[in-house]
């Protein structure tokens, strides 16, 4: 299978997000990479589903709360930026202060 660097990045995000989702479902608090991967994967999937950039920027703030992450992680994640593929092309989605 021949993958571009961008496709490899998306697969890595998806794999990390699966680990994060399983840990979250078991009641474990997510660390920094897990939290970012969890939010990033949701944004990528939302773009494929046809949501707009502004919808995804709002949606990204609803995915995790301070109770879902380890102490101090919410303060570390100031923004999450994901280059997502939309029906009309690739766009950068930025979610500011995603963990509230």
Swiss-Prot record:
GO terms for molecular function: nickel cation binding; urease activity. Its EC number is 3.5.1.5. It is an enzyme of class 3 (hydrolase). Pfam families: Urease_gamma. Pathway: Nitrogen metabolism; urea degradation; CO(2) and NH(3) from urea (urease route): step 1/1. SUPFAM superfamilies: Urease, gamma-subunit. GO terms for cellular component: cytoplasm. It is found in: Cytoplasm. Keywords: Cytoplasm, Hydrolase. The keyword Cytoplasm applies. Heterotrimer of UreA (gamma), UreB (beta) and UreC (alpha) subunits. Three heterotrimers associate to form the active enzyme. Belongs to the urease gamma subunit family. This is Urease subunit gamma. It comes from Nostoc sp. (strain PCC 7120 / SAG 25.82 / UTEX 2576).
């Amino acid at each position: 299978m021949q993958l571009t660097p961008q496709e490899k990045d998306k697969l890595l995000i998806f794999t990390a997000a699966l680990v994060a989702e399983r840990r979250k479902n078991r009641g474990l608090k997510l660390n920094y990479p897990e939290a970012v991967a969890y939010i990033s994967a949701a944004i990528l999937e939302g773009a494929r589903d046809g949501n707009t950039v502004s919808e995804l920027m709002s949606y990204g703030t609803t995915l995790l709360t301070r109770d879902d992450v380890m102490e101090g992680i919410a303060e570390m994640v100031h923004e999450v930026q994901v280059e997502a593929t939309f029906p009309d092309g690739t766009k950068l989605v930025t979610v500011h202060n995603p963990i509230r």
